[in-house]
Design a protein with these regions (language model features):
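A charge-rich, low-complexity, intrinsically flexible signal that marks solvent-exposed coils, linkers
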Residues: 1-179
Length: 179
């Protein structure tokens, strides 16, 4: 894939600066990071029972895991849109992390892999992140078929980007039973 102007890769060390600054690696088993694969397409969803239960959705891109904290379990019903708050990039090694982050540390709580697999962008993913709409196909144990991340307009005083994680209407979509 040819790279367009304005879609330059950030060196992994710089991309992980915020991630590393928030952690004490002498006290947590979380990976420090640093390894890089050439254009891998892995994804992982980690159930993170922290201050509030959420699901960390991560896509491998440019040698890091682009990350969002999803407020509820991802749904394969296109009518169920999930709020996904953009978080700092994580190292690729984090895709295999399961364990407990100690109390008093950033993200304290239990982390367990909920789903993992491969992802395929439906358009240039760097452009999609920049424009605020990223469309892709997932091939995981639980999450399959077409999905999209759509950035919401930023509200005053918001410090992080809010996105929606949405299941596309396809043969992998299911309608949730309504009460």
């Amino acid at each position: 894939m040819t790279r367009r102007a304005g879609t330059r890769r950030v060196p992994v060390g710089r991309a992980l600066r915020t991630y590393r600054a928030k952690r004490d690696f002498t006290a947590t088993a979380e990976p420090r990071g640093g390894r890089r694969r050439a254009d891998g397409r892995g994804f992982v969803v980690q159930r993170h029972d922290a201050r509030r239960l959420h699901y960390d959705f991560r896509l491998e891109l440019d040698g890091v895991l682009k990350s969002w904290a999803v407020t509820k379990e991802p749904s394969d019903d296109p009518a169920d849109k999930r709020l996904a708050v953009r978080t700092e990039d994580h190292p690729l090694d984090y895709a295999g992390f399961e364990g407990t982050i100690p109390k008093g540390h950033y993200g304290a709580g239990r982390v367990k892999i909920w789903d993992r697999g491969e992802w395929l962008p439906l358009e240039d993913p760097r452009d999609g992140l920049k424009r605020g709409k990223l469309s892709f196909v997932l091939n995981g144990r639980r999450m399959k078929g077409g999905w999209a991340l759509v950035r919401l307009s930023r509200r005053p005083r918001e410090t992080r980007e809010s996105w929606l994680l949405i299941k596309m209407r396809d043969d992998q979509a299911r309608r949730a039973a309504k009460d």
